[in-house]
Amino acid sequence: MPLSSHSERLMGTTITISLADERADSLLQKSFDLLKELEYRFNANSQKSELMEINHQAGIAPVKVHPDLFELISLGLEHSLAPSSHLNISIGPLIQTWRIGFSDAKVAQPQEIESVLPLINPHSIELDSSVSTVFLKHKGMKIDLGCLAKGYSADKVAQFLREEGVTSALINLGGNILTIGKNQSRDNQPWQIGIQDPANPRGNHLMTIPVVNQSVVTSGIYERHLTVDGKDYHHIFDSQTGYPVETELASLTIISDKSVDGEIWTTRLFGERPASILWQVESLEGIEAILIDKEGHLSCSSGIPTL
């Protein structure tokens, strides 16, 4: 059966869903309706989003939130508090200071960075699961779920499509890929997912991997960056220093069953040395990694050849 596809610009990127089903038009419409609902819930750049209500009430009062938002913040907080984690959902003030990826991006001044660093503390996020409330203890704190929201949303769409009986689909949220089943438009073969060459324009791949019922999430310093006076500043920040993380990597790809896990581990591990990343990935069940350094060298975890 041929694939039916639909694309829209949401969550700051182009989202495309392709699926093989006689009800494709209706299922695609419902999938994008779900994505729009989730964007409204999680968007850190919309003054009207549910997440922004939490940020507006920082230092004032707890905010009761939708179960999806509470679940995602809880998950993000758990991984923000993990030892040596580079993921930090309280990084919002820093993201808003630099604005990399937006039209008003700028190099933050040292005094600006110094003023927001004390606010970037996940220990100051209070959750009450009995009433689904979130409270930011200090005025000026901001949660940013940009490192998790696309993966979580992809998983929600996949859950919906599976419940509807869809057996062949590809969900592409700006390069974050999640597959359902095999590609029915290609003789039911595994989906072939390209790994972007960081040194060349989008669509140039260093390798291609076969994927069935898995997610492929890539984080790279080439994705969004700002160049000022010949110096590049990328969008992956070190919440300890307030500056873009110093790294040997150009990109890190995580292959996992759930897309949100790919988002978690690309963020948690980006900033570690390549050898350390591979060592940690080998201890994680159901997680594989592909690393590309700034020199273009590629290294993979042990499960990649058998995928």
Name each model-derived stretch.
Residues 1-307:
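Mature catalytic core of soluble alpha/beta enzymes
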